[in-house]
């Protein structure tokens, strides 16, 4: 396990530089005790993708690939898996619900093995490179990419800001409340 402190860097820029090498970013904006870390996941390896319930048992498959490593470190990630679980995965956990779920082109569940990360601790104002296998090649690539970031120009985005008509939005809220009361849904996410 390698943990190397580095200078603070804009994690989003890594994604801009190479989205294949840096595919996932969890960024905290409420820098308090419970939301103090931003994590840029690096060097994706094997993946497990569930597209249909009948393909395989996703959670059992994931568990068979996970090795528990015990590290007494004060960081939220020291190597492991980045996992996306859709609401539809409930169809494998509670099979009676599977027939009621909508089909989609988006995977039901998706896991990617991630050996390295760049982690910013906003509370301590420190940034670290973490590599679970002490892989100098990956660590040096991250450091090289950091140097390359200095040459990325700042660009503004042209366009207009628009938002949905307020009446249409509030009608959607009312409809959602009706669905919840009727028991048709248990959660609704609305955004504007």
Regions found by a protein language model. Name each.
Residues 1-192:
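Signature of the chorismate-utilizing enzyme
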